[in-house]
């Protein structure tokens, strides 16, 4: 599944969907060529989240775009999603792999050099589909992260691992090319697509930065 880890990665945020419903944003992003979608709705109840995940999986299926679930391995299983994105305080990735199986897409946030050192100490060859440099730039969509790692952080992680590198945090059309140039295999965005008047065109524009 690592060949899917390239291009544009949409991370959802309903309050930032200023011009369209979230489901419409996801469909337009898929038609614009988004490679991966992560459902990340922290304020939803488990029932709401599950219903939305099932709906998004249905929307994305014709486009063959995988759907990942933020944090919740149980809701990934229940919804039939393709995998999970895990933060440093979530379920350990090895447990997620044991539960979800070898074919699931599992990505892990790397917020500090210490995070990477701990990961590779536990397993020198972690079976993860991607590592996410988070955040690259300061971003209002996620306030519980460490200090921004910048382009230097992207370069550093790319040099350290053969696992595909996803860059997330404050990425938009004005800086995407620099992030890709620093070594990101995939750029993850929130407001750059969710808040766009035309999410399809926004997705195409970001894809064209590669």
UniProtKB/Swiss-Prot annotation:
Organism: Leptospira biflexa serovar Patoc (strain Patoc 1 / ATCC 23582 / Paris)
UniProt similarity note: Belongs to the thiamine-phosphate synthase family.
Keywords: Magnesium, Metal-binding, Thiamine biosynthesis, Transferase
Pathway(s) where this gene product acts: Cofactor biosynthesis; thiamine diphosphate biosynthesis; thiamine phosphate from 4-amino-2-methyl-5-diphosphomethylpyrimidine and 4-methyl-5-(2-phosphoethyl)-thiazole: step 1/1
Enzyme Commission number, as recorded: 2.5.1.3
Reactions catalysed: 2-[(2R,5Z)-2-carboxy-4-methylthiazol-5(2H)-ylidene]ethyl phosphate + 4-amino-2-methyl-5-(diphosphooxymethyl)pyrimidine + 2 H(+) = thiamine phosphate + CO2 + diphosphate; 2-(2-carboxy-4-methylthiazol-5-yl)ethyl phosphate + 4-amino-2-methyl-5-(diphosphooxymethyl)pyrimidine + 2 H(+) = thiamine phosphate + CO2 + diphosphate; 4-methyl-5-(2-phosphooxyethyl)-thiazole + 4-amino-2-methyl-5-(diphosphooxymethyl)pyrimidine + H(+) = thiamine phosphate + diphosphate
Chain residues that bind Mg(2+): 71, 90
Record-listed 2-[(2R,5Z)-2-carboxy-4-methylthiazol-5(2H)-ylidene]ethyl phosphate binding positions: 139-141, 170, 190-191
GO molecular function: magnesium ion binding; thiamine-phosphate diphosphorylase activity
Cellular compartments per GO CC: cytoplasm
Requisite cofactors: Mg(2+)
UniProt binding sites for 4-amino-2-methyl-5-(diphosphooxymethyl)pyrimidine: 38-42, 70, 109, 142
Pfam family, one: TMP-TENI
Gene3D superfamilies: Aldolase class I
Classification via InterPro entries: Aldolase_TIM, ThiamineP_synth_sf, ThiamineP_synth_TenI, TMP_synthase
GO biological-process terms attached to the record: thiamine biosynthetic process; thiamine diphosphate biosynthetic process
This protein's record includes keyword NADP: no
CC cofactor note: Binds 1 Mg(2+) ion per subunit.
Role, per record: Condenses 4-methyl-5-(beta-hydroxyethyl)thiazole monophosphate (THZ-P) and 2-methyl-4-amino-5-hydroxymethyl pyrimidine pyrophosphate (HMP-PP) to form thiamine monophosphate (TMP).
Protein name: Thiamine-phosphate synthase
């Amino acid at each position: 599944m690592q060949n899917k880890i390239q291009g544009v990665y949409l991370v959802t945020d309903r309050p930032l969907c200023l011009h369209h419903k979230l489901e419409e944003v996801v469909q337009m992003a898929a038609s614009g060529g988004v490679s991966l979608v992560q459902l990340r709705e922290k304020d939803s109840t488990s029932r709401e989240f599950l219903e939305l995940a099932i709906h998004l999986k249905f929307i994305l299926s014709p486009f063959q775009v995988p759907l990942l679930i933020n944090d919740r391995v149980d809701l990934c299983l229940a919804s039939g999603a393709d995998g999970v994105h895990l933060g440093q305080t979530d379920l350990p990735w090895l447990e997620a792999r044991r539960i979800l199986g070898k074919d699931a897409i599992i990505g892990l946030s790397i917020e500090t050099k210490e995070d990477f050192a701990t990961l590779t100490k536990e397993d020198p060859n972690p079976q993860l589909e991607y590592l996410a440099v988070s955040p690259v730039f300061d971003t209002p969509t996620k306030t519980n992260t460490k200090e921004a790692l910048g382009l230097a952080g992207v370069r550093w992680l790319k040099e350290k691992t053969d696992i595909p590198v996803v860059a997330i945090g404050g990425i938009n059309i004005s800086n995407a090319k620099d992030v890709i140039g620093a070594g990101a295999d995939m750029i993850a965005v929130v407001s750059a697509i969710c808040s766009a008047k035309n999410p399809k065109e926004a997705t195409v524009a970001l894809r064209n930065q590669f």
